[in-house]
Amino acid sequence: MPKLKTKSGAKKRFKVTGTGKVVSAHAGKRHGMIKRTKKQIRQLRGTRTLFKTDGDNIKQYFLPNA
């Protein structure tokens, strides 16, 4: 049976760390920031770690070779 292909959209959005956790960028920072406070915008910087169950699903279905 051939290897499963990685979903190309997922490999642009998620990264698997060395310990196996899945990280992604925060959502909600593309447009409409005029409504948000400076603190809210600042807290959307960087990456976030997904919950274990969500990360396991991402690795199983979208990033099978990671």
From Swiss-Prot:
GO terms for molecular function: structural constituent of ribosome. GO terms for biological process: translation. SUPFAM superfamilies: L35p-like (SSF143034). Gene3D superfamilies: 4.10.410.60. Disulfide bonds: none annotated. Belongs to the bacterial ribosomal protein bL35 family. This is Large ribosomal subunit protein bL35. It comes from Afipia carboxidovorans (strain ATCC 49405 / DSM 1227 / KCTC 32145 / OM5). The gene is rpmI.
